[in-house]
C-alpha cells in the first residue's frame, strides 16, 4: 500500500471503533472498558497488517484536561467522553477525535460544540499551499475571541500526520514553517471549561493544490454522539 492507502486503511479502523463505542457506551462503563473495546476492534480490523494505536480516553470532568490515558472512572449520566484515536496501518498513522455524550448535553455544551464545528470548517478554508502554519492558530483564536470563547482552546489547531501520529509543523504559535502540497494533516478544534467539561472534534485531510480535502468522512453533528 502507498501512504494514502495506508491512511485510508487506518481511518476505516477509526470509523469502526467509533461505531463500536456508540453501541457500547452507557452509564457504568469505564474508560478502561472503552480502551479494551478499542483494542479488540483494532486487532480484529488489521489481523494481517503491522499496526498499533494510541489515544485519549477521558470522561466526565476529566474531559476538561484535554486528554489522558484510560482509568477505571465509570461514566455517569450527563458525562461527556473524548476519544482521540491514532491508528497505525503499515507505516502511516491516522489521528481523529470525537466527543460522545451520555444523555442530552446542556445548552452551554451544545453551543460550544456548534462553535467547534464552525471553527473546524473555518480552519479547512484557511489551509492552503504555502500558508504559514501558525496563521491557522492565530486566525482560529481571533474567531474564538469574537464568539466569546477566548482562551478556551489551550492547544494547537491541528498538525501534520504520517510516519508519526503527531508531526510538525503544528498549527500553533511559533510554528512558522509553510505547509506544502501533498501533506496529511489534522484539524482538531476543542473547547474546555476547567473542572467542568471539554469537547473536541478532529478530522484528517490531505492538502491539494486547491486546498484541503477531507479524508475522514464520518459524522460530526452532536446528535449522532448522544448515547
PLM feature spans:
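Active-site neighborhoods and metal-handling regions in enzymes and metal-associated proteins
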Residues: 1-227
